[in-house]
Amino acid sequence: MIKEWESVIGLEVHLQLKTGTKVWCGCKSDYDESGINLHTCPICLGHPGALPKLNKKVVDYAIKAALALNCQINNESGFDRKNYFYPDAPKNYQITQFEKSYAEKGYLEFKLNSGRQVKIGITKIQIEEDTAKAVHGKNESYLNFNRASIPLIEIISEPDMRNSEEAYEYLNTLKNIIKYTKISDVSMETGSLRCDANISVMEKGSKVFGTRVEVKNLNSFKAVARAIDYEIGRQIELIQNGGKVDQETRLWDEENQITRVMRSKEEAMDYRYFNEPDLLKLVISDEEIEEIKKDMPETRLAKIERFKNNYSLDEKDAFILTEEVELSDYFEEVVKYSNNAKLSSNWILTEVLRILKHKNIDIEKFTISSENLAKIIKLIDKNTISSKIAKEVFEIALDDSRDPEIIVKEKGLVQLSDTSEIEKMVDEVLANNQKMVDDYKSADEGRKPRVLKGIVGQVMKISKGKANPEIVNDLIMEKLK
């Protein structure tokens, strides 16, 4: 009998909080855009006798994350030392929350491509500190302690995911939720979001989980999905061939698309956790939580409803425009300047997203400002240019930041709306295309629009795209009655 297998997946996500300063001291939390080892002090370097002091902003941001992820926030929690010896840990321990974290029992929900709704539990969120950044050369390694003690929250999911698609969508949803709170850049590219996957397999229907393997070195959401798929296959094959899965930590090898053994997995006892003696218990009052609730930014779900109601967008368009908070902000700025929500939505969903996809960039690196895109839309609104010419102006504006009105005048792209001039062109086309005229007159009501479109196209060709298409259309229909 062939056994069927089921995978069990849990994710641990580390997020850097953009508080401006580190978690235990006043050093700047900037480690990539400045010189090496500039933002350090005796506290974040772990000098003997240097005492940590908890940054209040870290707690506020951590509470925002917990609220956004539907967590229960504990009024009292504490800090613990996780002891281990590694070059990037200057104190030879990490301050974290092991015994009791500040938030627990949360969840997030999302829909898969199939339409199935999935709810993933969040075991807990804990406040901790980052390590120094190791930079590896050919024959040596360097340590940048600018990153040491940058504030982190670790979001630990329940082992509720059953395949790589669910894990991928969990990460996407988590990223969007946190981005809306503006507490973190949530970027794997810059390291402000890091993810480890815990993966095991069991016989389908079993209530006993298999041996868990942790996979690290995952540098994109797609890498997470690929590593999960590989590891599930590896574990099933190993068991079916009579072997057993060892509890271990493995690294994802992106080049070869496999996981490799890094070390045997440590148990909690290996880290000799004990309460942090240099910090008081973390006390969060209900009043503090309520104050932060009032300061919470609009959620994506609330924004979708507002976009539908205020801008008359359908569900699909509102969903796409709110997928990234920066894109939704860009859309609202374009609407503010153009006063035309429908055209703004259409241009962003087609032309802007086309460029973002082609260049593989996000809206923050898009070269046309919201004000300039709005000006292009207003030129269409005022019939100064046609939609076709607007696309030409758009392409020019990608590399030219000047006012679109200046570009239109300089390139001679102003739309022709002089009826007498357009009429001459219409007459010329009708005189030279008798077959199309006859075809239009003999066509049934279903074919007439297609034939008309062809005649309009001929007029637009003569005018080099400048003739007002509405006037062209009206004149042709009048003459072909």
UniProtKB/Swiss-Prot annotation:
Recorded GO MF terms: asparaginyl-tRNA synthase (glutamine-hydrolyzing) activity; ATP binding; glutaminyl-tRNA synthase (glutamine-hydrolyzing) activity
GO biological process, one term: translation
Keywords per UniProt: ATP-binding, Ligase, Nucleotide-binding, Protein biosynthesis
Protein name: Aspartyl/glutamyl-tRNA(Asn/Gln) amidotransferase subunit B
PROSITE patterns attached to this UniProt entry: GATB
Gene of this entry: gatB
Enzyme class: ligase
Domain of life assignment: Bacteria
Pfam families in alphabetical order: GatB_N (PF02934), GatB_Yqey (PF02637)
Function according to Swiss-Prot or TrEMBL: Allows the formation of correctly charged Asn-tRNA(Asn) or Gln-tRNA(Gln) through the transamidation of misacylated Asp-tRNA(Asn) or Glu-tRNA(Gln) in organisms which lack either or both of asparaginyl-tRNA or glutaminyl-tRNA synthetases. The reaction takes place in the presence of glutamine and ATP through an activated phospho-Asp-tRNA(Asn) or phospho-Glu-tRNA(Gln).
